[in-house]
Structure formats: structure tokens, C-alpha cells
Amino acid sequence: MKRKGFKFKKEVQDNMKKLLSLALATVMALGLVSCGNSSSGGNSATSGSAASGSASGADWPTKSINIVVPWSAGGDTDFHARTLGQYLEKELGVSVTVVNTTGGGGSVASTEVKNSDPDGYTFLAFDTAMALNHASGITDFGGEAFDPVAIIGKSCGEFLVTQGDAPYDTIPELIEYTKAHPGEVRMAANTGATSYYAAIKLSEQGADLNIVNSGSSSERVAALLCDQINLSVNAYGVIGQYIETGDLKILGCLATERSETYADVPTAVDQGVDLSYDLIYNLLAPKGTDPAIIEKMSEACQKIIEEDSSYAEAIATSYGEKPFYMNSSEAVDFLKGEDDMYMEYADLFQAKS
């Protein structure tokens, strides 16, 4: 019989079903995960940026904008970029295309955008993994290599998730199980991503895990459902439907504090496990982009995030989040602090790589 684990409040469960069906369908349609067979996805696209040449802040934008996402379609960072992009089209009056450029734990996309022309038509939508890429030695740069536009969202928490019939229901039970069954539990963790940080912190506290690379958030869910892996770190909107059906269950929340959205789910710290972090979503431009363009884009994001009730409803319905925004100057300071924090773990990250 499948164990229940921790579940979301009933009033938010139905809101996720449509999103999750579409997300998993996207993953399967792209052939990113095949049950019963190992598979890997290559880069889904390049940035397709417009012809080089600087744009004037006075008349920007005059053509299509590309937002490059380092992960495949169907995950949380992709969701935030696509949702914001739809509203930016209305606000800016030009088309906004989301381009999924995968690989290297997000470093392929970040390097591509860093080296792009600062013409105001190519942006990067990334998350906390950018700082972890730097700390892990995957890249030699952090947020300082870009002109930050804004912090565009804050996750209500990532969750440690396993199959519904797994023989452990909490994080301490998981750790004890792996001690008795060393290497048996396969945890998906991408080097330089939050999942990798979680795996290292669990290992520090005695968990004996078989750490494997299994792609983006949506790919990890598909791999869990196919029993290719046993443990994953995922955001709210990617797992809710499968928690409700009992196919998956939550062992704990990895955020720094509980959210009212999932108040019944204890954090890892609540369970006596030293593992917590916040997942932040950001929007960045290549270094040297006209400050007037940065300001216009940041103000457009602010108007959508802070004033548009339909946007607030969209992120609440799909990911249980509240609107969260920081302007460009605030983003500069935040990204530096985030980078500095994870660089304290650089020796440990690189030793495990």
C-alpha cells in the first residue's frame, strides 16, 4: 500500500492538475525520458538572437525579444519565463520568445547570453543555480557578469520527493534507510544546481546516496514516475498532481521557512536536518546593455508582477507563489550576496564534482 507522506492543502491540489498534465506531456513529447530505457536530451535550441547592433533605449523595443532558459520546457524556471513573457508581450508590444538552451547544469545558456550582443533583445531567465554553477567551478562567473534586470520570482519552496511506496516517510527515515542500504537510493542531482546542493548536504549528514544526473525538473518527475530514480528535488507546481494520486510523496520542504501554501509540510530543519535554501528566479541581460533598456524592462516586469492581478493568480494557481520583485539595483546586491554565500562551499562542491 502506498504511504501518504506529506500532502498539500486540499484547496490547492486541483489547481495544479492542468499544468502538470501539460508539463509532463511536453517532456514525453520531446522524448526527454523514456520509461525502461536510459535517455538524455541535448540542447533543445540556441538563442536565435537577433542580428547584432545596439538598440537605443529611446525607441526600444522595435522587434522580437528572446528570453533564454537554461532548462527544458515544463519546469519551474521555464514556467516563470513563459508566464512573464506572455504578459511582457502585451506590455511592450512586441513578441517575446522563450528559447530552451539546455546543458552543463545551465552553464551553456548562461555562457551564451553572457557572450551575446548587448542589444536589448536577448535576456537570460535563470535561478539560484547560477550561483551554484559558479561555486561548483562549472563557470568562472556569477551575476556580476551580467546586467541584472530584476528578480522576478521566489519559489514557495522545493521539496524532497520520492515514490509513493518508498519505505521512508521523512528525511531522517531516508537517511537511516540509506545507511542500512548504501548506494541503493538513486538521487537525481545536477552538478551546479540546487538539487546538487541538497544531495551534498544530505551526504554530509550521513545519507549514502547514489547520485545521478537526470536533467531538468520536469525530466526528474518523469524519471521518478518511471522508477529510473528514487529521489528528487522539485518545485510545487511540478509534483502536486502526483502527490494527490499517491504516485509520489513528499519527505519534506527544503525552504528556509514554511509557507502558508504548504503549512502542513515540515521543512528539513523542522525535522532536525541541516538543509535549507530559497530558490529565486532572475532576469538578466548581457553586460553593456543600455541602462535605459534595463530600466524599461525592469519597470515592465514590476508593473506585471506587482500590479496585474491575473499574473498573480497565474503563479498562485500553478506554483502556490506570491508575486515577488526586486528592481535592477536590488538584484545586483541580491545576486552578489547569493554568489558569496554559495562560494563558501566551493571547495566542497568541487571536491564532489
Language-model regions, residue ranges each:
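Beta->alpha turn/N-cap motifs
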Residues: 125-130, 189, 216-217, 234-239, ...
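C-terminal lobe and pocket-closing loops
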Residues: 239-312, 337-340
